[in-house]
Structures are given as C-alpha cells and as structure tokens.
Amino acid sequence: MGMTRSKHLVLGFDQVIGKDKRFKFETYYQTLSNIPVTTRPSSFSLANTGSGFSRFFPDTLVNSGTGTNYGVEFTFEKSFTKGYFYMATLSLFDAKYKGSDGVERNSDFNTDYAFNALFAKEWKVSKRGILNLGGKITMAGARRYSPIDTFASRRQREYVELDAQKNTLRFGNAYSRIDARISYKINAKKVTHEIAFDLVNITNNRNILKYSYTSDAPYFREEYQLGFLPVFYYKLDF
C-alpha cells in the first residue's frame, strides 16, 4: 500500500485583546487522495477508521479513495492570570469521502460542529497549599450511522450495515458531556502532593456510540459511551 496524500489550504486570523485574551479564526480546505479502499466496489474507506471500536476485515485494498474536508474554527481564550483561565472553541465543518464505488458520502467523523469550553480557578489557601476547581463542556452534532442489513446480521450474528446506504442516518441526540474537577496541591520542600477528584459526565448523559446486534427483533440495540464516572487519585511529584 502507498501513502495517503493530502493538500491543505489554510487562512487564519489572530488578534490579541488586552494583556491576557486572544481571539483566533481559521478557515481551511483539505483534499485527500490515495486513501485505501477495497478493489471491489463498496463504501469502505480507511478514512473512516478510528471513529469507533468496531472490528473490520476489509478485502484487498488499493490506493484509489478520495476525501474532502473544509470548515471554520473560532477560539477565544484567556491566559492564566489573576488565578484563573478559560477557553472556548467552536468548529463548523463538513467531511466527505468516496469509496471504490465512486459515491460521495458523509464520513464517520462528519458531525457538522463541535464545541468545547473549559475553565480553571486557583486559590492559594495556605503558604504551601493550592486549591483548584475546573470544568469542561463538550458538545458535537449527532453521529452518523448506516441502516442494518437484517438478513446478513441474523446470519452472521453481528450488526451488518447496508453498504449502499452508508452513513445516511443519524442518531437522535447530539453529543454532550460536562466534566468537573477539584484538586488540592501541597508544595513541600522535596515533593509535591496532589489529591484530586474528577467527575466525568456529571449529568450522566447517554451519548450513543453505535448499534450492536441482538437476536430479538428489531435485531439491534443502542450501545452508549461512558456514563457518570467519579475518579479519585493521589499523585506525588518529586
């Protein structure tokens, strides 16, 4: 197999606001070529790998696939001054590809938009102790998926997509997740102690990851991404 090739065209704008804030804008256009696809006509493209955890066993591959990505990104950030910082980013984009069947489709990564916002605040509560509180919000458009091939799925006992209708449907809900973190750090002479408590997906939002096969009609069920997860840890830095 040969190497996948890409060409990029990028235009950006960066503006410093005051002493500690910055606004950035970037628009881009990218073309992809030589993407591995199957020799027989199908919707498969290696450009989609990495979007999930499904196994795939492709036929013989050839470097003839293509793809196109374009969009805009906005970033507003405040650097760490006066004991706190924050940053927000918004991406609006479109991602298409062509398999060996020559049909242009939405890629697995084409959620149309993504939004992230994070902040952290720090308080010095003693000579050596620092309390930190932070949070993060992540949002993205609904993931795309393909209708089930019921006959093939029942025969193979796993979710088999209708190849001709690859990524023509979308899950009902957009992706959203809120994380929070609180930590306490003690700066000793030779070592730094840190005790932290992370709250992952504190609203326990049920974000759909994929559909999987089930033996009962309608022969598929929803599989969800990580729900609420509290994580405690203690760290030593020497």
Task: Give residue spans per PLM region.
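Membrane-embedded beta-strands that build the outer-membrane beta-barrel scaffold
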Residues: 9-17, 21-29, 72-78, 84-92, ...
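C-terminal beta-signal and adjacent terminal beta-strands/loops
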Residues: 33, 38, 86, 138-159, ...
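Extracytoplasmic loops and strand-loop junctions of Gram-negative outer membrane beta-barrel proteins
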Residues: 6-7, 53-61, 98-102, 160-168, ...
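Gram-negative outer-membrane beta-barrel transporters
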Residues: 29-31, 51-142
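Outer-membrane beta-barrel domain signature
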Residues: 1, 60-65, 104-106, 167-171, ...
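Residues that define the transmembrane beta-barrel architecture of outer-membrane proteins
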Residues: 5-9, 66-70, 107-115, 174-178, ...
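Membrane-embedded beta-barrel scaffold of Gram-negative outer-membrane proteins
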Residues: 2-57, 198
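C-terminal beta-barrel architecture of Gram-negative outer-membrane proteins
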Residues: 110-185
